[in-house]
From Swiss-Prot:
Substrate binds at residues 82-84, 221-222. This is NADPH-dependent 7-cyano-7-deazaguanine reductase. NADPH binds at residues 84-85, 250-251. It is found in: Cytoplasm. It comes from Alcanivorax borkumensis (strain ATCC 700651 / DSM 11573 / NCIMB 13689 / SK2). The keyword Lipoprotein does not apply. It is an enzyme of class 1 (oxidoreductase).
Length: 274
């Protein structure tokens, strides 16, 4: 993946404040999926990458600055993800550009990001007043973080996942301890990860050990969640599986990949760290 060094993440960048769609940079999904032995035509999951951008501003027709929150939903079936720093630079390019309306801004973002991702996407813009009423994600299910264990493995170990013997059940596990690293800058990424499943009971202690083993693992947010989905399917074989990552923001943007073989994307509710 040496080509990633040539993306905006891999080099210093100038900040442009006039609308410039060419700043957007695609990253092929197939690169990481090859390592997981996934074929685009037969993915074992569906879902979306939900992006929240908190630093969007443009000028109205009178030259007055307008600010808004931006939500983007990029289906996991698109051939590309959007390199996150390039999206930040692209959104910054709206700052001193005049637009007729909020919908004109929304339409421009939807068109440009869809072209970069290689498929249809959805964009929503919200005023700060509208955003203020959005609920925060509520903890539901079993949080594994308070299990008292000794830890030795901080390198990727999918074999740590274990299933209890017994009848099929439906459960939800979550952890706020997920940490991984950007494959370009090696900066740490932090997330809450939620797993919902129907199948043999996943051992909460083993799930916690597995989450901790990703602590020094490299991958973009989307790749980490797909890796977790594949590992859980391989090690535990649940009939239904959902993996949802809520990553903390960087550069005014948070990315929240959702992968499932049975559910549609959950509501876009920020966690306490977002």
């Amino acid at each position: 993946m040496s080509y990633l060094k040539e993306t905006p993440l891999g080099r210093s960048s100038e900040y442009v404040d006039q609308y410039m769609p060419s700043l957007l940079c695609p990253v092929p999904r197939w690169d990481a999926r090859e390592g997981l032995e996934l074929e685009s035509a037969t993915l074992p999951f569906h879902g979306s990458d939900i992006w929240n951008a908190y630093e969007l501003s443009w000028l109205n027709e009178k030259g007055k600055p307008i600010v808004a929150m931006c939500e983007l939903r990029v289906p996991c079936t698109t051939p590309n993800i959007v390199e996150s720093k390039s999206l930040k630079l692209y959104l910054n390019s709206f700052a001193n550009t005049r637009f007729q309306s909020r919908d004109a801004v929304r339409a421009a973002i939807e068109k440009d990001v869809a072209q970069t991702a290689g498929g249809n996407i959805e964009v929503l813009l919200f005023s700060l007043q509208e955003s203020a009423g959005f609920p925060v994600w509520e903890d539901r299910g079993d949080c594994v973080d308070n299990i008292d264990l000794n830890f030795e493995h901080y390198e990727y170990r999918p074999d740590l996942l274990l299933c209890d013997q017994g009848p099929e059940q439906t459960g939800q596990l979550y952890s706020h301890l997920l940490r991984s690293h950007c494959p370009v800058t090696d900066q740490p990424d932090w997330a809450t990860v939620v797993v919902r499943y129907t199948g043999r009971a996943i051992s909460p202690a083993s799930f916690l050990r597995y989450v901790v083993s990703l602590r020094n693992h490299q991958g973009f947010h989307e790749q980490i969640i797909e890796q977790m989905f594949v590992d859980l399917m391989t090690q535990c074989s649940p009939r239904h599986l959902t993996v949802y990552g809520r990553f903390t923001r960087r550069g005014g943007i948070d990315i929240n990949p959702f992968r499932s073989n049975s559910e549609q994307p959950l509501p876009n509710r920020r966690t306490i760290r977002q």
